[in-house]
Regions:
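Alpha-helical and His/Cys-centered functional microenvironments
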Residues: 9, 23
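Short hydrophobic targeting helices and cationic amphipathic motifs
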Residues: 17-20
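Glyoxalase I/VOC metalloenzyme domain signal
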Residues: 25-65, 69-206
Length: 206
């Protein structure tokens, strides 16, 4: 529950009590189990900035819905899960493409470039092995109808794409989710930016 929601629910007296402890809530950067990805965040930001520059991608006006990790080691996934539960709450856990995908609602957002991101996606390992386990993509919300998501996202990209970049389209869907979630991803094989028409919170609530 975010601060304004808590104030509304608890009323003035309860909000005053809550305010006394709110600033003591744990930020992800102080969690022992997350120190590997805390240390990596600045590197990820630098790579993301270069990625945007190469594509001349001007997307700062769009909401960064979430940031996602990747890993192939189950022990790493479990450690990250334990860590995020100390600085947020589990919003959702769904089976998508045969593996669990966890979404964490953070009490304090993570700063990535000019975005404040308070949702982290943790996909559990599948069959792939990665050269690197850590931050993988940022997903942005394009506020358009689902049926034109692909066209709208491609309009933001240069044509043709620079060498080494590729585009992939998909439609991930959890077992209980009703909203369509068409997704377009552009990647250089290391960093990925994805676009979809709804926030993950909207999709989970559907």
């Amino acid at each position: 529950m975010k601060r304004w929601q808590a104030f509304k629910t608890l009323g003035l007296f309860g909000a005053n009590l809550l305010h006394l402890n709110w600033d003591n809530m744990t930020h992800f950067s102080s969690i022992v189990e997350l120190q590997d990805i805390v240390a990596e965040l600045a590197i990820f930001e630098q790579k993301l900035a270069r990625f945007k520059q190469r594509l001349n991608l001007n997307v700062e006006q769009y909401q960064a819905d979430h940031i996602s990790l990747r890993c192939h080691d189950i022990s790493v996934a479990e450690r990250w899960r334990k860590g995020f539960l100390q600085c947020g709450s589990l919003m959702s856990e769904s089976i998508i493409n045969g593996r669990p995908i966890c979404l964490f609602d953070l009490e304090h957002p993570i700063t990535v470039l000019n975005w404040q991101i308070d949702c982290v996606e943790l996909p559990y390992p599948g069959k792939k092995t990665y050269l690197h386990q850590g931050w993988e993509h940022v997903e942005l919300v394009l506020p358009v109808a689902p049926e034109i998501l692909s066209t709208a996202a491609k309009a933001l990209l240069p044509q043709p794409l620079p060498t080494g970049f590729s585009v992939k389209e998909s439609q991930p869907k959890g077992e209980q989710e009703r909203l369509p979630n068409p997704t377009l991803a552009v990647t250089d094989g290391e960093i990925t930016v994805k676009f979809h028409p709804f926030t993950l919170r909207e999709i989970v609530k559907s």
